[in-house]
């Protein structure tokens, strides 16, 4: 179910403050966050945000095509290593 249009998109307050502070200073720093549920808003375009995937922070550069998506969509949490090469040995 999508979020109601009557409500604003969710962005964590601490993340919004950091983005606004960097926009006023016109500096580029990596913003570290654990908030995967935050929505990407137009003021964050051009920033690099390090999103936590459960193990480490992955730096993601925000572009205009990412606006409206959640931060967690760009930091995968699972790492599929592939199926076993030869399954016949384990069946014997």
UniProtKB/Swiss-Prot annotation:
Keywords assigned: Chloroplast, Plastid, Ribonucleoprotein, Ribosomal protein, RNA-binding, rRNA-binding
Gene3D superfamilies recorded: 30s Ribosomal Protein S19, Chain A
Cellular-component GO terms for this entry: chloroplast; mitochondrial small ribosomal subunit
Family of this protein: Belongs to the universal ribosomal protein uS19 family.
Subcellular location: Plastid, Chloroplast
Gene behind this protein: rps19
The protein's name in its UniProt record: Small ribosomal subunit protein uS19c
PANTHER family: RIBOSOMAL PROTEIN S19P FAMILY MEMBER, SMALL RIBOSOMAL SUBUNIT PROTEIN US19M
């Amino acid at each position: 179910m999508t979020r109601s249009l009557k409500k604003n998109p969710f962005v964590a307050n601490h993340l919004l403050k950091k983005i606004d502070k960097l926009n006023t200073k016109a500096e580029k720093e990596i913003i570290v966050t654990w908030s995967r549920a935050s929505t990407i808003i137009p003021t964050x375009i051009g920033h690099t945000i390090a999103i936590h995937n459960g193990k480490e922070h992955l730096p993601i550069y925000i572009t205009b095509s990412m606006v409206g998506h959640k931060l967690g969509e760009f930091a995968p949490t699972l790492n599929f290593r592939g199926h076993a090469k030869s399954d016949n040995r384990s069946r014997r």
